[in-house]
Swiss-Prot record:
Interacts with NLRX1. Interacts with ATG16L1. SUPFAM superfamilies: EF-Tu/eEF-1alpha/eIF2-gamma C-terminal domain, P-loop containing nucleoside triphosphate hydrolases, Translation proteins. The gene is TUFM. It is linked to Combined oxidative phosphorylation deficiency 4: A mitochondrial disease resulting in neonatal lactic acidosis, rapidly progressive encephalopathy, severely decreased mitochondrial protein synthesis, and combined deficiency of mtDNA-related mitochondrial respiratory chain complexes. It comes from Homo sapiens. This is Elongation factor Tu, mitochondrial. The modification N6-succinyllysine is found at residues 91, 237, 289. Residues 1-46 form a transit peptide. Belongs to the TRAFAC class translation factor GTPase superfamily. Classic translation factor GTPase family. EF-Tu/EF-1A subfamily.
């Protein structure tokens, strides 16, 4: 193993790179493997990180950048960290550190949702940089699922584009109620009237998707100018205005701390010498070090214990709903787990294969299907961090479901997954979002339904 390989391995565990307990064992093991002069610096970095404890002294809010590919979402994320780092509110993350997968750097696009943290004077933020490329909408759905609000990035020289619409639609479907707009690349446009037209288009689009288009804060600027320290009006000051708007327009959500904990697993990592880490955003409840838990879904029912919790490299004794965290789990290998599982308090919830739901079928104009569908139509359901093939079972009196209709019908999943009353989901067919819904009831499977052939 090379020094670079070891560093890559450690960077691949963004929530859990340096647990205090057992770090000596980890570092000694790496020293024996590498015998490289560069390692002591790595060791010192890990040792320092291991001592940090997350202090909950401000309200915590989850936000994210959404928008069309190459409109500057990642550049803006980097610029925010740079500006806040000057006052001690963040650690500066370069563009390359946010787009950290080799394929992303090679293609110049964000594929997986990336997470950074920062603090304003009023709040602590976990910021998700959501992928904008059309091929990676599945990852974008996972990225936006836990967001309390979004920053929609639109390039002034392009205006709203296809993924601008799709991201707004998906954000609306999964319950993101507050959006702030950043019109980026204003330095590339000489005509101020063009910028005004772009702003008008954006406000109309927001209204079309059910947001308050006239009230939504729209900030014009250049993330690249902010990042490079040029043109303070378009650069530094625009990002400061954006952060003020996020602080004031996106409310601190009410967190459900009373119910048993529920953590949808976004990713799974292996930390050498320590064990396996699952990451995600705690949907509800309180998760503490030492808690017993179950991991459910995808035909799995695994019982284990949480032996450590971190948020952005800082240790936590307890995590609260809304926290973006990594949890070390006892006695499990990375290959035992996968994204889409849900970590819960033992016995608090069980997977279901059949639900009743209220579903809005998107019209052709909204990017949905052009034609109606019949019973046993098979889209893919997306909810929390999982996706699963399902069958739509229309009521006996309903022969066809038409685009634009709001219907109640049953859904049967290929495998039981975590579903409960009030849970939101999205239905997709190929690369098209066809519907959005809410679970109204969980149902028992009939013998006939248990024998359905899925092919």
């Amino acid at each position: 193993m090379t020094t670079m390989a070891a560093a890559t391995l450690l960077r691949a565990t963004p929530h859990f790179s340096g647990l205090a307990a057992g770090r000596t064992f980890l570092l000694q093991g790496l020293l024996r493997l590498l015998k490289a002069p560069a390692l002591p610096l790595l060791c010192r970095g890990l040792a320092v990180e291991a001592k940090k404890t997350y202090v909950r002294d401000k309200p915590h809010v989850n936000v994210g950048t959404i928008g069309h590919v190459d409109h500057g979402k990642t550049t803006l994320t980097a610029a925010i960290t740079k500006i806040l780092a000057e006052g001690g509110g963040a650690k500066f993350k370069k563009y390359e550190e946010i787009d950290n997968a080799p394929e992303e750097r090679a293609r110049g696009i964000t594929i997986n949702a990336a997470h950074v943290e920062y603090s304003t004077a009023a709040r602590h933020y976990a910021h998700t940089d959501c992928p904008g490329h059309a091929d990676y909408v599945k990852n974008m759905i996972t990225g936006t699922a836990p967001l309390d609000g979004c920053i929609l990035v639109v390039a002034a020289n392009d205006g709203p584009m296809p993924q601008t619409r799709e991201h707004l639609l998906l954000a609306r479907q999964i319950g993101v109620e507050h959006v702030v707009v950043y019109v980026n690349k204003a330095d590339a446009v000489q005509d101020s009237e063009m910028v005004e037209l772009v702003e008008l288009e954006i406000r109309e689009l927001l209204t079309e998707f059910g947001y308050k288009g006239e009230e939504t804060p729209v900030i014009v600027g250049s993330a690249l100018c902010a990042l490079e320290g040029r043109d303070p009006e378009l650069g530094l000051k625009s990002v400061q205005k954006l952060l003020d708007a996020v602080d004031t327009y996106i409310p601190v959500p009410a967190r459900d701390l009373e119910k048993p904990f529920l953590l949808p697993v976004e990713a799974v990592y292996s930390v050498p010498g320590r064990g396996t880490v699952v990451t995600g955003t705690l949907e509800r409840g309180i998760l503490k070090k030492g808690d017993e838990c179950e991991l459910l879904g995808h035909s799995k029912n695994i019982r284990t214990v949480v032996t450590g919790i971190e948020m952005f490299h800082k240790s936590l004794e307890r995590a609260e709903a809304g926290d973006n965290l990594g949890a070390l789990v006892r006695g499990l290998k990375r290959e035992d787990l996968r994204r889409g599982l849900v970590m819960v308090k033992p016995g608090s919830i069980k997977p279901h294969q059949k639900v009743e739901a209220q579903v809005y079928i998107l019209s052709k104009e909204e990017g949905g299907r052009h034609k109606p569908f019949v019973s046993h139509f098979m889209p893919v359901m997306f909810s929390l961090t999982w996706d699963m093939a399902c069958r739509i079972i229309l009521p006996p009196e309903k022969e066809l479901a038409m685009p634009g209709e709001d219907l109640k019908f049953n859904l049967i999943l290929r495998q039981p997954m975590i579903l409960e009353k009030g849970q939101r989901f999205t239905l997709r067919d190929g690369n098209r979002t066809i519907g959005t819904g809410l679970v109204t009831n969980t149902l028992a499977m009939t013998e006939e339904e248990k024998n359905i052939k899925w092919g």
